[in-house]
Amino acid sequence: MKTRCFDHIDLRVTNMEAAGKFYGKILPQLGFVHESPGDDYYTFYAGGGERPLEFFCLSEDKNHRPNGTRIAFWADTREEVDQISKLVRDAGGKNLEGPEVCEDYSPGYYAFFFEDPDGNKLEICCREKPVFAD
């Protein structure tokens, strides 16, 4: 049986220093507990111990152009979504929508949609009832 379905996210940014500062204020609140900066990358790790590591990596690409891809991070409660949405705005993220209830997604879906300083689209969400496969 698989222990997880993805290993990491590698997001392109145009300014590593600015992106490291921005994500350094947000990702620790989402469970990423270790930072590993490098010259052309910046990695935030979650997991460890009995859990395999998962990581969110920033890679600098001066020619990067954002697209319609959106990455959604899980929050345990609506209050956590609200708290992180404030951190995002204070860190310079662009508020696109919310925080708000998105019933058309699924019952009890609550989310905040935003762009990072490079224009990459992200989301913080929680669900009253998580989705399970049949």
Give the label of every model feature segment.
Residues 13-18, 73-117:
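Vicinal oxygen chelate
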Residues 120:
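Conserved Rossmann-like nucleotide-cofactor binding loop
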Residues 1-20, 71, 128-134:
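N-terminal beta-strand motif that seeds the catalytic metal site of vicinal oxygen chelate
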Residues 123-124:
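Short glycine-/small-residue motifs
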Residues 44-86, 91:
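Long, continuous compositionally biased terminal/linker segments
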Residues 10-54:
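Core segments of cupin and vicinal oxygen chelate
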Residues 58-60, 127-130:
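Acetyl-CoA-dependent GNAT
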